[in-house]
């Protein structure tokens, strides 16, 4: 079984938000979890782009007092790959 967490942002956005629960779930699912980033282009869906990132949240240490994280879009985008 695979799980995909989808985050879409308007083209040019600098950050995206991910909750502590989403991070924890991704970390427990390991290779069964993918983060899908959707770059939504203002010129329409023909210009949208998608990147898949595996083990996207492995570098984050969860904190019980933190409910969400603002992550740098560019950092994750550069780690991803387009769909096959």
Residue ranges and their predicted role:
Residues 10-21:
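Active-site-adjacent loop/helix micro-motif of nuclease/hydrolase catalytic cores
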Residues 20-22, 27, 61:
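Solvent-exposed, flexible loop/coil residues
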Residues 5, 19, 36-38:
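Residues in well-ordered beta-strands of folded domains
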Residues 1-8:
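Conserved catalytic cores of phosphodiester-cleaving nucleases, focusing on short active-site segments
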Residues 13, 24, 42-45:
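Accessory, usually C-terminal, subdomains that scaffold auxiliary metal cofactors
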Residues 29-34, 38-84:
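Domain-level recognition of nuclease-like catalytic cores that cleave nucleotide substrates
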């Amino acid at each position: 079984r695979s799980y995909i967490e989808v985050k879409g942002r308007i083209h040019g956005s600098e950050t995206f938000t991910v909750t502590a629960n989403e991070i924890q779930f991704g970390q427990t699912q390991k290779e069964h979890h993918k983060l899908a980033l959707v770059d939504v282009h203002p010129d329409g869906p023909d210009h949208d782009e998608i990147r898949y990132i595996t083990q996207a949240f492995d570098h984050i240490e969860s904190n019980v007092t933190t409910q969400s994280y603002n992550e740098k879009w560019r950092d994750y985008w550069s780690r991803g790959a387009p769909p096959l």
